[in-house]
């Protein structure tokens, strides 16, 4: 079923290389379901892993190749996260009231392909749990008036290079994550505070709502 208000650790879809170990030279892709928020590979206890997962829903493009939680996945198991859109809460002082929610979606009405990384973690029970994180960068253009960060939107002509597990050149991978002029890709509209509760879930959450007054 469609989920219009995804919370950390909820299931999300990813597109990944069909053969994450790089033996398939055809570059075929596979759709998979994972849990949102990467689990650090060194963790051994479920409670600790879930707590860590909630803190790792996003990975910064500037440091992803260095952070212990993310660096191995960045080098070998990258993915695309297809999304109808995403919510962001205003932090820019003076322009919008604090925590004014916005829904940001593709201008063409299609799916937004967001850059991500994924990994598998084995729980103490032996269960293998696949998890993923969204990659973010400094906000650009109009999105900068809402929040200081934004997802890395991955153009179609970069998908094959991004998903190829044999592509381990850090500089090339970092160059793929550079996105400028996001306003040509996405459009933002203010929405109701109803999205603040994960108990609310429906397409109506994405309907444009009047802007709240900024605090003075």
Protein language model features and the residues they cover:
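Short, His- and charge-rich active-site/binding loops that engage polyanionic ligands
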Residues: 1-78, 105-109, 115
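Short, structured beta-strand/loop micro-motifs enriched in basic residues and often containing a Trp
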Residues: 60-64, 129-137
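Short, catalytically relevant binding-site loops at active-site mouths
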Residues: 86-88, 110, 120-121, 141, ...
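Cytochrome P450 core scaffold surrounding the K-helix E-X-X-R motif
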Residues: 90-97, 163
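Short, surface-exposed polybasic-and-hydrophobic patches located at secondary-structure transitions
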Residues: 95-108
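A motif-centric signal for short, conserved binding hotspots located
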Residues: 105-125, 132
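C-terminal accessory segment of soluble enzyme catalytic cores
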Residues: 135-216
């Amino acid at each position: 079923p469609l989920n219009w208000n995804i919370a950390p650790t909820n299931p999300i879809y990813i597109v990944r290389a069909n053969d994450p170990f790089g033996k398939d030279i055809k570059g075929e892709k596979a759709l998979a379901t994972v849990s949102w928020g990467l689990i650090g590979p060194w963790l051994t206890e479920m409670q600790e892993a879930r707590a860590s997962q909630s803190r790792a829903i996003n990975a910064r493009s500037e440091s992803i190749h260095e952070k212990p939680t993310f660096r191995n996945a960045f080098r070998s198991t990258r993915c695309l996260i297809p999304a109808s859109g995403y919510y962001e809460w205003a932090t820019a002082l003076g322009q919008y009231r604090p925590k004014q929610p916005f829904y940001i979606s593709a201008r063409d009405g299609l799916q937004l392909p967001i850059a991500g990384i994924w990994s598998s973690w084995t729980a103490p029970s032996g269960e293998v749990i696949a998890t993923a994180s969204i990659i973010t960068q400094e906000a650009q253009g109009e999105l900068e008036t809402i929040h200081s960060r934004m997802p890395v939107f991955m153009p179609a002509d970069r998908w094959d290079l991004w998903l190829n597990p044999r592509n381990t050149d850090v500089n090339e991978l970092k160059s793929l994550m550079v996105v400028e002029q996001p306003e040509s890709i996405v459009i933002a509209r203010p929405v109701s505070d109803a999205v603040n509760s994960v108990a609310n879930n429906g397409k109506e959450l994405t309907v444009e709502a009047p802007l709240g007054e900024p605090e003075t």
